[in-house]
Amino acid sequence: HEKLVFIDGEMKELQNYPPLIEANVLSIMVAHIAVKNNTTYNTDGMPATTSRRIVTDLLRDSLNFNGLIVTDALNMGGVRNVPEAEVLAVQAGCDIVLMPLDADKAYDRLLEKYTTDEQFKIEVDNSVKRIIRAKLALGLMNEE
């Protein structure tokens, strides 16, 4: 929790995910772990939370996960020194960002990006749809 840790090479832990996804797990939390020496999913020294290769290419596209993708706490050591980590996490494909160092600044950066970047706006709008679907599935909202 205090520093960025690395997976070196093959990601053996991935074998646990397909059965969970097939069982319709509603959400997956992405950890602040970097991947190195992996030609497909190398995160270039950045936490997986901020990596489109991990969040979108792997979880969404390769593993066909359609539920919510949530960051681990953004105030943790493995990611707290990454500038605009909350924006990078959303750009990577995360739907929900947890515990940024400064929630007000994070909100301002996310709002600025949302209002000035059409692709980012599309990502956020898709995340909102997934969040609403999850709430409906859990009976937390009416369909009205």
Residue spans of the language-model regions?
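Mid-to-C-terminal alpha-helical segments outside catalytic/metal-binding sites
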Residues: T115-E143
